Amino acid sequence: MGQANRKPVIIEFYGLPGAGKTTTAFAIQKQLRNMEIRVLSPKRIIDHQFKYKEIVLSKEIRDVYIIFLKALFLVRPITRERIRFMNLAFNYWLGIKNFHISGKQKNGICILDQGIVQAFVSMAYLGKITNKEKYCRCIQQVVDMLDNVIFVNCRINPDISIMRMRARKPNGGRLQQIKNDNELRKMLQIQMLQFKKITEKSVKGAITIHMNEQAEANAEKIVEYCLGCSYKSE
């Protein structure tokens, strides 16, 4: 598996609800463990809650937080929900950064079924981005600061997404509350277009997976890419 002091690799998914991100993440974990590759817990990333003293005491972190704030102020109207997603995106960024520099977990692969990019798209959901170029530049800036992160763009047919969402337990996300399929399809198409506009210029090098296939087949493709391009022995 290469050098023992290598930073962990992080796989981060983004895409429509019902795309099968979580299911595919579990399939990847299973394949990696069968190959005796260490799968690192994402708990330290997901559960990380930044403290404002982290921003005050570190100029680097403060400068990065300002980038997230700039992105927030490019979306109208500013709401509590958008602020929540801005802080969530920053939490993921800081969690990944700390995960890499802590030195406690090395030589393995960590899988996030959603993360920074998903939070940025959610922050702009049904809002007006006053300057898309600047918004995308904010995302690109913070993404480029991270090492060893593989972004997976999950494409899905909206009708399959609807079918999977309807099969979930009730009380899910915002879109799952829409009961009319035609209205839900319309909202998914809007979000799909938003994903494309926001990510096509800001997330360089992302791999695109068509999630209409079975999770195991998609997991195999991602594992092959991960091992071949980003986790090969030195």
Summary of predicted features, one role per range:
Residues 46-127:
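ATP-dependent small-molecule kinase phosphotransfer cores
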Residues 18:
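Walker A (P-loop) phosphate-binding loop of P-loop NTPases
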Residues 21:
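Conserved lysine of the Walker
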Residues 35-51:
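Short beta-strand-centered segment that lines the nucleotide-binding/catalytic pocket of NTP-utilizing
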Residues 24:
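Hydrophobic positions on the alpha1 helix immediately C-terminal to the Walker A/P-loop
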Residues 13:
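Hydrophobic anchor at the beta1->P-loop junction of P-loop NTPases
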